[in-house]
Swiss-Prot record:
Main function: Cleaves peptides in various proteins in a process that requires ATP hydrolysis. Has a chymotrypsin-like activity. Plays a major role in the degradation of misfolded proteins.
Assembly information from the UniProt record: Fourteen ClpP subunits assemble into 2 heptameric rings which stack back to back to give a disk-like structure with a central cavity, resembling the structure of eukaryotic proteasomes.
GN (gene name): clpP
GO cellular component, one term: endopeptidase Clp complex
Protein name: ATP-dependent Clp protease proteolytic subunit
Length: 197
């Protein structure tokens, strides 16, 4: 059962009830929680585009608590984060793993945060193939190309040499918030929201 809290606001014109995500959107906050698939990506992309059209001078806050998911869905979010004019601040609470950590790192440099007990995990993309040998070969080439593309972006976003990224993403690589800061995945570990601009 998916329970979404409702917030009631009072105004001179009476009461208005919002689901919690709509209320957060009024404050330019987008929640990315759970596995990243096409539906989640479409929702996040629509919210990014809406907030940017509303005011491209104000920052957008993307809160992440995700185990990762689809590479293509995640890259669609990544491209949209770069496409919008507004700066996108990223904040991990809980976990940012796999594509979740990739999107955390995609935030505006200087505005990528983690709460003290957050976990961040990077690794290479996962995939599988079946069918004729030629189809398997095509799929294998595609996942190797995808790995190279993701590693190149991570190297650029973290400042780490590509060889270090390749080594460190070869297996699941878990980091604390402090370790993620030292690595360059985030810019600050924050205790409270006063660090946000």
């Amino acid at each position: 059962m998916n329970l979404i809290p409702t917030v009631i606001e009072q105004s001179s014109r009476g009461e208005r009830a919002y689901d919690i995500y709509s209320r957060l959107l009024k404050d330019r906050i987008i929640m990315l929680s759970g596995p990243i698939d096409d539906n989640v990506a479409n929702s996040v992309i629509a919210q990014l585009l809406f907030l940017d059209a509303q005011d491209s001078e104000k920052d957008i806050y993307l809160y992440i608590n995700s185990p990762g998911g689809s590479v293509s869905a995640g890259l669609a979010i990544f491209d949209t984060m770069n496409f919008v004019k507004a700066d996108v601040q990223t904040i991990v609470l809980g976990m940012a793993a796999s594509m979740g950590s990739f999107l955390l790192t995609a935030g505006q440099k200087g505005k990528r945060f983690a709460l003290p007990n957050a976990e961040i995990m990077i690794h290479q993309p996962l995939g599988g193939a079946q069918g004729q040998a030629t189809e398997i070969e095509i799929a294998a080439r595609h996942i190797l190309d995808t790995r190279q593309r993701l590693n190149s972006i991570l190297a650029e976003r973290t400042g780490q040499p590509i060889e270090v990224i390749e080594r460190d993403t070869d297996r699941d690589n878990y980091m604390t918030a402090e370790q993620a800061k030292e690595y360059g995945l985030i810019d600050e570990v924050m205790e409270n929201s006063s660090a946000l601009n």
